[in-house]
Regions:
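A low-complexity, Ser/Thr/Gly/Pro-enriched, surface-exposed linker/loop concept
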Residues: 12, 44-84
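Catalytic and substrate-binding clefts that recognize carbohydrates or anionic sugar/phosphate headgroups
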Residues: 81-224, 234-235, 240-241, 247-252
């Protein structure tokens, strides 16, 4: 049986730019492009088309936050004709009609061939995607039943559209905003505005549509085996000894776990001076609860458990933090002033110091991070979502030096790594397990409050609420009363062990 790949322990090091390079083929094949002065139509496949309009006549050939590969390696057979000022492009799957003017509902349309069971297989620019079979949502906080989902790439009407116009581009650069960039690559706004759409006209060939979407946005990372197992997560003020005793009890009762999720009480929370704000963000161990963090993490490893710590990065690094003096100096702040080091992912000096702070804790035994970003989608850079940037940078950083990359976070749009969800209500009412693949979500993990044997989620994390929290009381597992909780944990672990 294949062994789970190892997550190597890291040490504080300067980033190797090679770890942040992207393996991408972003330029379209020249022989698959039909274009004019201000427009460009790229036939990536006979069913996947890129539509661009640029007032400046400058088009983007570099990778974006979403799209890495626009050259699939083969010419696309098509017939191109011009009639009455309109360009007509016929492929095996599509008929495109375009008036060579700024995109409009009247001037740009696509007919998807071979879709007999709908009257809506023709797309006009700007049409609402009423038949879209959806992807997922950024968060399930407070969800109770049906919620609005983002669009995916498959549809009952045979077509779907992804608008990449606002996405930043990924560039190789030695400097960012006049500062040295130790990462080699960076995310930058587009130099010129353009409309940049991807049209998926696969009819009901859903698997093919999703497969080509994965090719467009980059390959699916392979998860280490342990990540497929059961994770223990409870929002509760554990002590070091109490947590280890609980892990030992689970083992005695035959309840298998592979991963320990330590929620936010691993760091200082309640004793933070109000002058610094709340204790929601923190990077300093709570020594009253965890007096010897390296020993605690080593004890978890000896029990065969990987460890992830919950972090809410929004408030940056404040003067009460252990790492504050060094981080402040790195960004040009005199530590004596106790000025807050702002969380700013557009500043490479901060990002470099931020990751060094994490590397030191990884050297103590932290395996990976639970990035629990909840504060919206705005940074100092136009179009750059902080959650996306966190996911992107943490995932690449976790793979430095040949390590097996793994990051646990929320969904920030099509393509990022393993997302999590915080469920406040019964998971059975949400019905989302089958949806995320349409936005490159091949592994999804849910907190489950009500566990039933029929629930076979792609990922299941079995949490309990912090003492005093609302909605759901802690659920005790009695050794003489097997519950669905125990049954599901054992069932899932058996399934993991059977994987090749």
């Amino acid at each position: 049986m294949a062994q789970s790949p190892q997550l190597k322990q890291s040490s504080p090091t300067s980033p190797d730019p090679q770890d942040f390079r992207l393996d991408a083929t972003p330029a379209m094949r020249a022989d698959n492009v039909v274009s004019g002065e201000h427009w460009r139509i790229g036939l990536i496949t006979d069913s996947l088309v890129r539509f661009e309009w640029s007032d400046s006549g400058v088009f983007e050939n570099r990778p974006t936050q979403t799209v890495l590969n626009r050259d699939f390696g083969s010419p696309v057979e098509r017939r191109v004709t011009e009639r009455d000022g309109r360009v007509i492009i016929d492929t095996a799957a599509l008929t495109i009609v375009y008036d060579q003017q700024p995109f409009s509902k009247e001037g740009l349309s696509v007919v998807v061939k071979g879709v007999a069971d709908t009257q809506f297989n023709t797309w006009h620019y700007g049409d609402a995607q009423r038949g879209n079979l959806k992807g997922t949502a950024r968060t399930l906080d407070e969800a109770d039943g049906a919620i609005e989902l983002d669009n995916g790439v498959i549809s009952r009407d045979g077509w779907a559209v992804i608008d990449d116009s606002a996405a930043n581009i990924i560039i190789e650069t030695d400097t960012v905003n006049g500062k040295a960039n130790p990462f080699g690559t960076w995310v930058s706004p587009r130099a010129t505005a353009e409309t940049d759409l991807y049209f998926f006209g696969y009819g009901h060939r859903y698997i093919e549509a999703v497969r080509d979407f994965y090719r467009l946005t980059g390959p699916t990372p392979l998860l280490p085996r342990f990540a497929m197992g059961n994770w223990w997560s409870r929002y509760y003020r554990y002590t070091q000894d109490g947590y280890l005793a609980l892990m030992d009890r689970f083992k005695r009762e035959g309840i298998p776990f592979t991963t320990s999720v330590i929620d936010m009480d691993w760091h200082r929370v309640d004793d933070v001076d109000p002058k610094y704000g709340s204790g929601w963000t923190g990077y300093s161990w709570n020594r009253e609860l965890f007096p010897d963090p390296p020993a605690f993490l080593a004890d978890l490893h000896r029990r065969g458990l990987r460890t992830t710590l919950n972090v809410h990065p929004r408030d940056g690094v404040r003067a009460f933090e252990d790492a504050y003096p060094e981080v402040a100096k790195r960004v040009g702040i005199d530590p004596a002033t106790e000025e807050n080091v702002e969380f700013d992912l557009t500043n490479p000096d901060f990002v470099d110091a931020y990751f060094d702070m994490h590397h030191r804790m990884e050297a103590e035994g932290v395996d990976f991070w639970w990035l629990d970003w909840q504060q919206g989608g705005v940074t100092r850079q136009k179009g750059l979502d902080p959650l996306w940037m966190l996911n992107h940078m943490h995932y690449l950083d976790s793979g430095r030096g040949g390590n097996w990359p793994l990051t646990f976070s929320r969904y920030a749009g099509p393509g990022p790594p393993l997302p999590g969800r915080l469920l406040r209500r019964h998971d059975r009412d949400l019905g989302i397990a089958r949806l995320p693949a349409a936005v490159h979500r091949h592994r999804f993990q849910h907190r489950v409050w009500l566990v039933e044997p029929r629930h076979r989620r792609p990922h299941v994390r079995l949490p309990q609420r912090r003492a005093g929290g609302p909605l759901v009381p802690a659920r005790r597992v009695q050794p003489d009363q097997p519950t669905a909780f125990v049954q599901l944990a054992v069932l899932r672990q058996g399934a993991v062990e059977l994987q090749p």
